[in-house]
Amino acid sequence: VENRRRFLAEAAGSSAATLVTLRQIHSGMIRVVEADDLERPGGLQTADGRAMLRGDGLMTDVPGVMLGVQTADCVPVLVADVKRRAVAAFHAGWRGTLKRIVERGIGMMRLRYGSRPEDLLAAVGPAIGPCCYSVGEEVRYEFESQFAYADELFSEVYDSDPVRDKYPLLFLTARAPGHSNIGPQIHLDLWEANRRQLLDAGIPAKRVTVVGECTACAVYGDRKKYFSHRGESGFTGRMMSVVGVANRFA
């Protein structure tokens, strides 16, 4: 609890700000936070401080509310309407990206708050990059069925083995009958996939910032810079990305 107060004081300039988070479920579900939600006993948290809302997107126009999404490889996307004072936060793994959670979220902001894409600022935060994010063929198939530009999101990466590269015939004959050669890994660019959704929603490219740092391999000095579920084999923490509406008189 004390750590959360310090975080709010740093991010919002006031520990009195209200932080709203989600029980993230890798969905396309987006929840709207209204002033009435915060007036209920306990607000949007359980007695032990856990998030009550399930989903992977949040939006609000309530002053003093901070929206947070937690990631450790998935993509955090933050959006702010600087004219209508509304914000949104999205947690986009490959499933949420496939469900167009970011693109749909911008549409919801337009309907609910009257947001215009040209007034929005968006940030695609640190996430696992195309350098490290290998996926199965079934994921590529799913994206190809949904996005006309899917080919631009995938690359094929071959492992380099000096011995195998020098003596390829040795490795061919060593494989059991019926087994093919070692094929390439398929890598997915979630940064670009979510940037494209922001552009498709009408936000000008110059108003979209992509941090472009990979959570699995970025370093700071001699240490890993970010938590990474894949880079740390599932034993890791979580980062929180936050956006909110400032209290005019704070």
What function would you assign to each model-found segment?
Residues 1-250:
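Active-site microenvironment for binding and transforming phosphate-containing groups
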